[in-house]
Amino acid sequence: MLWAHRKKRKAATETTEDKPLESHRANDSWIKSHFSRLSEERLPTYRYVSNNGHSPESRHGEVNTTLHVDTLTTKHGERGAALHRDSFASKQKISGSSMTKEMQRESGKSPSMEDDTWAAVAACTKEIDAKGHRVANSMLQRSTTHRRKGHAESRNISPEELKALEEVEIKLKGNFLTHHETGVAGANQSHTVYSQSRHSNQSHHSYPSHQSNQSHPVYSSYQGHHPSHLSPQSYPSYSSHQSHPGHSNHQGHSGLSSHQTHLGHSNHQGHPGHSSHQSHQGQPGHPSHQSHNLPNRRNPIYGS
């Protein structure tokens, strides 16, 4: 009996030892096949076929990948712009679960055709930079609002300078920077709209003596006048008030206090809770007393 139990245990241990080895081999083979399939699908898009004509994948299941990277560097010196090319060759070899990688670097000057191309790019860039500086300086010199407001208007640029700048820009775009044309056009359009909006806002702030004839929606107007003292151009349903010779104009703004005089007539604006007193010029002996926003007080009426 003991011998039979020992034999069964020995057989069970052998089978358990064989199963992990078989499962490990199966997993290893699956990983290898999966990795090789990924290499066949993705790696060919980043590699170059060798010049000797052999397939990148050899007969023994090896995968060879060669990647060439060229880096061009422009250096400005006393003799002008010099172009240097750095060539990198990366070789990768995969054999089963092992992978070897080699990287070589070769430096040298680029061919004459590439030198001419980069020289043309540098010339166009320098030309557009110089013209851009001239246009900016002329705009700043002719601008009258720049010294006070801190920005220049688009109308201060002359059409000749703008045309010359656009010609160089189109030349540069058409030859080398075609894919940036949409972005530059959008940037120029947004800058123009910004300049126009800033210019439209200046008309409201540069002339404070003419704001009595304009009404802004951000200020609320309170009317506490008696009907016998309203000016002919004052309507309760409108927020704009106009002052004419011989008539007084009253406006109440919350948080805003101003005192303006037009053509010898007084125009007072009072805060809520304060009384405003005015006398009409040319009509002595007829004082007019009016209060704004006083719920517990009445407006006295004087006979004319």
Curated annotation (Swiss-Prot):
Superkingdom of source: Eukaryota
Compositionally biased tracts (Basic residues): 1-10
Basic and acidic residues bias spans: 16-27, 151-160
Signal peptide: none
Residues modified as Phosphoserine: S39, S158
Biased composition, class Polar residues, residue ranges: 91-101, 208-223, 249-263
Start and end residues of each stretch annotated as Disordered: 1-28, 91-115, 138-160, 190-304
Protein name in UniProt: Uncharacterized protein C10orf62 homolog
Keyword Electron transport annotated: no
Organism expressing this protein natively: Mus musculus
Keywords: Phosphoprotein
Composition bias, Low complexity: 195-206, 229-248, 264-292
Pfam name, any one: DUF5569
Intrachain disulfide bonds: none
Keyword Iron-sulfur among record annotations: no
TM annotation in the entry: none
